[in-house]
A protein has these predicted regions:
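Short Ser/Thr-interspersed hydrophobic loop/turn segments at strand-loop and sheet-helix junctions
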Residues: 17, 40-45, 136, 152-157, ...
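Internal helix-loop-helix
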Residues: 7-84, 124-131
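A structural signal for short hydrophobic beta-strand segments in well-ordered beta-sheet cores
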Residues: 105-108
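Glycine-rich phosphate/pyrophosphate-binding beta-alpha loops
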Residues: 97, 121-126, 168-169
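A short core secondary-structure module
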Residues: 113, 117-161
């Protein structure tokens, strides 16, 4: 199964100290410069090695490194690095595509949680994800380009439903993800 193979490959790289060639050493990466990263990537391609999924390693991790709290960094980065947690992206929405200013998925504050309602589309391999990093509207009164927040949501949270989208080739590599009163801790 593709998901198991990719997780296993990430674990092998991690065990050899190569789990994140693009990460700084302070976060468990190699700390390599761009040239060494490129040479490593070329060797992996030449050896027909599996890919490393970008969602955790190259998309959410750099955001956490730059803007996350110390608690978020210690909670999420090691599990991304060793392949324990699989991530997917929650940006696009039906009828909006990648126009983030028009996103409609809402996250309303309720005490120390957000309550998320809405739908995301074109979530690559989301059916295998443990977590989704999601853009949500937290201030509907703000200009469309503002009032948007970045939440980290556990895919096992009650109220989440993943529906595969059949592609022209018959595969199910993308999904729609529905959020129905999904409670997310404010610290995420």
């Amino acid at each position: 199964h593709v998901a198991n193979d990719l997780r296993r490959w990430q674990r092998i790289l991690f065990d050899h100290g190569w789990g994140a060639t693009m990460w700084p050493a302070e976060f468990g990466g190699t700390g390599w410069d761009k040239t060494r990263q490129y040479l490593f990537d070329i060797e992996c391609v030449t050896g027909d090695a599996p890919i490393q999924l970008p969602f955790g390693l190259k998309m959410v991790a750099p955001v956490l490194m730059a803007y996350g709290s110390d608690a978020q960094k210690s909670r999420f980065l090691p599990r991304i690095l060793d392949g324990t947690d699989w991530w997917c992206q929650g940006y696009s929405e039906p009828g909006s595509g990648s126009d983030l200013a028009s996103l409609k998925t809402r996250a309303d504050r309720d005490g120390d949680h957000y309550v998320v309602n809405g739908q995301k589309a074109w979530n690559t391999l989301g059916q295998h994800a443990d977590w989704i990093f999601c853009l949500v509207r937290t201030d509907p009164s703000a200009k469309p380009q503002r009032g948007i927040s970045f939440l980290l949501i556990d895919m096992k949270t009650p109220g989440i439903r993943v529906q595969p989208t059949r592609l022209l080739d018959g595969r199910h590599e993308v999904n729609e993800i529905f959020f129905d009163d999904v409670r997310v801790p404010g610290g995420n």
